[in-house]
Regions:
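Non-catalytic, usually N-terminal nucleic-acid engagement modules in DNA/RNA processing proteins
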Residues: 1-208
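Short, flexible hinge/linker loops that cap or flank conserved catalytic cores
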Residues: 210-212
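Acidic catalytic cores of enzymes that act on phosphate-bearing nucleotides/polynucleotides
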Residues: 214-217
Length: 225
């Protein structure tokens, strides 16, 4: 079963604690979700994660799509079994990685860009490897240059095959140097993509009804605005 239970609220209503119930265990919120990008948390074993109090692990749909492939992870029993982690798992949609790697972002990212220039954020001397349109994102693999295309439907298909308890809707990543007009355009595109993700998620959930239920979470966008 899957669900969310509120356990307490602040008097002003601006904060709460709760419990997310998943097929692989409960998550007390607010929670730090450990990042295991390629279905592996660097330098820590699953047992060590448990000893440290980790409640859940997040893997990356984009990276697992490229290597070793979501079909292989599916055949292994899903991302949890693939990484020998028996607790709750999350996957993100791949949108951030597709677009950030495509633009060649540096590590300099901040909400206050008054003292920054585009050169501080966008890596120099790199061709843009990702192009966005209303249908999705076309990009080249940084591994071998192969051309791929992610759409909301493709992201949902990959994440269903990865089998995490919680999946993320496919969204468009923008930079703090995009104009407000473009941010609004991208936000509306992300909203439409979320609707497409939900429709495909429902279709795949019915098609794979024998599998444990996977939840779909939305992504809040809007950049600095």
């Amino acid at each position: 079963t899957f669900g969310f239970q509120v356990t307490s609220r602040l008097d002003n209503g601006l904060g709460r604690t709760g419990i997310i119930h998943t097929p692989h265990g409960d998550i007390e919120t607010p929670a730090f979700i450990v990042v295991g990008t390629k279905a592996s948390v660097k330098a820590l074993t699953p047992d060590q994660l448990t000893d440290l109090g980790a409640q859940a692990v997040l893997a990356n749909a984009y990276h697992l799509f490229l290597q070793p492939g979501h079909d292989l992870v599916d055949e292994a029993g899903g991302v949890g079994q693939f990484m020998a982690w028996d607790g709750p798992t999350f996957t993100d949609s791949g949108g951030f990685q597709v677009l950030s790697l495509g633009a060649g972002f540096k590590k300099t990212l901040a909400m206050d860009v008054s003292q920054l220039t585009e050169a501080d954020v966008i890596a120099a001397d790199r061709d843009r490897k990702a192009m966005v349109d209303d249908g999705g994102v076309t990009f080249r693999s940084p591994l071998n240059g192969d051309l791929h295309r992610f759409t909301p439907e493709v992201s949902m298909s990959i994440q269903h095959r990865l089998g995490a308890d919680v999946m993320m809707a496919f969204d468009e990543l923008t930079t703090l140097f995009n104009t407000r007009a473009y941010q609004e355009e991208a936000l509306e595109r992300t909203r439409r993509w979320a609707e497409r993700c939900l429709a495909e998620h429902r279709r795949l959930s019915a098609e794979r009804a024998e599998r444990p239920y996977q939840a779909l979470y939305g992504v809040i966008q809007g950049a600095q605005y």
